[in-house]
Amino acid sequence: MGQKVNPNGFRYGITKPINSVWFAEKQNYGDLLVQDAKIYKFFDKLVRKYQIGNTSIKRTKAQKVTVVLQTSQPAKLLGENGANIEKITQDLHKYLKNKSLDINLQVSLLKQPELNARLAAEAIAQKLENRESFRVAQKLVINDALRAGAKGIKTQVSGRLNGVDMARAEGYSSGEMRLHTLRQDVDFAKATARTIYGAIGVKVWISKGELLEGDK
């Protein structure tokens, strides 16, 4: 039987860059891995507010941590004269309970946010929380992605849709979506909509076409 695998994990190191880039000795590896997980969790909560499409972590031998945030709204994330990014850095230190950690937050512009699966999934989740139709929410995101140049897109929502007693999954797809072709540049993300009927899961797959050699 065929097994479903996360399209991102399937492509890491082959056609997708790895989000955490660092090396550690065996005795420190576990602590740094847990720290990475906490950093990702911290910025997951800020995705909607600042439209953060991707987060990556780099560490040097001197244990300097660089967190690169790709956002479609860099001015909002940075704040006036960088005041907001400084506050976020302080909040991150408190969250990690490590004020001595050398953390540097870098902000880069995310071009074509409509082709980012994470932002697309959060957009659908936000519409569901605002009591919009789950069908309309998915179709709007699909149309936006195709207009922005996506080769294919697939969406799925699952849970108590429209408040019915029995949970079910329903989705739409348009264009090409070859998940087993590693050359296919596929972005995948999940989000959760907290509604009065309970949690509704959202999944989005966006295909940007096939990668040629040297296009990683």
From Swiss-Prot:
It holds the Pfam family Ribosomal_S3_C. Keywords: Ribonucleoprotein, Ribosomal protein, RNA-binding, rRNA-binding. The keyword rRNA-binding applies. GO terms for cellular component: cytosolic small ribosomal subunit. PROSITE patterns: KH_TYPE_2, RIBOSOMAL_S3. PANTHER family: 30S/40S RIBOSOMAL PROTEIN S3, SMALL RIBOSOMAL SUBUNIT PROTEIN US3C. Binds the lower part of the 30S subunit head. Binds mRNA in the 70S ribosome, positioning it for translation. This is Small ribosomal subunit protein uS3. The lineage of its organism: Bacteria, Bacillati, Mycoplasmatota, Mycoplasmoidales, Metamycoplasmataceae.
